[in-house]
Amino acid sequence: MAQFYSAKRRVTTREIITVTTDGLDAFGQGVARHHGKALFIAGLLPGERAEVVLSEDKKQFARGDVKKRLSESPERETPRCPHFGVCGGCQQQHASVALQQRSKAQALCRMMKREVDEVISGPAWGYRRRARLSLNFTPRKPGLQMGFRKAGSNDLVDVHRCPVLVPRLEALLPKLRDCLSSLDGVRHLGHVELVDVTSGPLMVLRHLKPLSAADREKLECFSHSEGVALYLAPQSDTLEHLNGEMPWYESDGLRLTFSPRDFIQVNDAVNQQMVARALEWLEIQPGERVLDLFCGMGNFTLPLARRAESVVGVEGVAALVEKGDYNAGLNALKNVTFFQHNLEEDVTRQPWAQQGFDKVLLDPARAGAAGVMQHIVKLKPRRVVYVSCNPATLMRDSETLLAAGYRTVRLAMLDMFPHTGHLESMALFERD
């Protein structure tokens, strides 16, 4: 959710106030009222009373730090992760999953001015199938640090456990740490990316200087013994495949291959449900043509092609368009065409834009889809499904559809990232 702030107003006094929170924002901050404005307090849950020290005071809102909690919510939980509160990855492990989902759904409801019809969720723990861990070596203790950044800082939190990772990746952490620590070039490592999909786990190791033959041999031994596909990244845009098959995952009975650097949804369980719900909402009929904008490598496009007469996918990243074409052939889908085009530019003269479509699906990045909304209206599709990772731009873009006579038929909150402040959603719009 987008928030816009002016320059900080320094608090010159360390006044202690006592407040009771009456809500939780989508980021997991407690919300109270102080002098008629919102007071945001990290770590405090709805209904909890606390002594708070103001850390920031502005015209429309303020922020405070808990000095002493005076009461405890029944929805407060003990965080599972020993790094919670320091690591910047999660913000809400202290709140029950039900409270997290309810607060996010309420935030979405306020922004869209409509009740949320459902919350689409999966396991709250062990859901994250992709992670990037920073690496830093110091000659003295602790030696190799491997982990995530602190909240609001570039400092590294040395992570030994991460309960939001899928179990196979979390179990890999200590063995991976031992392997990397043993390398002669350990001081020249940048980060390691871990991915776990249907084909198995993989790792991408970014190294800043060439690795010795001995180090490469150690990494290959680790790859074979742990069953982990291995890629090296000597440059930020270069990959060297040392071991293991090309990664792939299953979706809607299809096999989707991808490069380790390609975007895939982090939460497989919610992604599967999201695709199924989009197909259900669109109600594809025989003979219909469907347009999929911001299509990536075909996460929605290919399942749509199994049902529609024909599907067009449009994506700005050339590598993803190539992967979409490859996956269409791999799955023997001959009724789908992919186009590369920057959807932030004028689309009206593009070949695909001259065609007619019965239904449209779009899944833009956080910036939304302002550049194509008017063209979608001109196409006059009967139904539009908008998948969003930013409710602020969903709200903005939906105004174009509503002004053109569409109505919001369904609204769902996607709990894609439990225990974090990320709020994702999807909406169905229909034209009478």
Curated annotation (Swiss-Prot):
Record-listed E.C. numbers: 2.1.1.190
One family name in Pfam for this protein: tRNA_U5-meth_tr
Annotated SUPFAM superfamilies: Nucleic acid-binding proteins, S-adenosyl-L-methionine-dependent methyltransferases
Keyword Iron-sulfur on entry: yes
Residue ranges annotated for the TRAM domain, each copy included: 10-68
Reactions this protein catalyses: uridine(1939) in 23S rRNA + S-adenosyl-L-methionine = 5-methyluridine(1939) in 23S rRNA + S-adenosyl-L-homocysteine + H(+)
Residues the record marks as active site: 389
GO biological process: rRNA base methylation
Keywords of the record: 4Fe-4S, Iron, Iron-sulfur, Metal-binding, Methyltransferase, rRNA processing, S-adenosyl-L-methionine, Transferase
NCBIfam families in alphabetical order: PRK13168.1, rumA
Purpose of the protein: Catalyzes the formation of 5-methyl-uridine at position 1939 (m5U1939) in 23S rRNA.
Protein name, per record: 23S rRNA (uracil(1939)-C(5))-methyltransferase RlmD
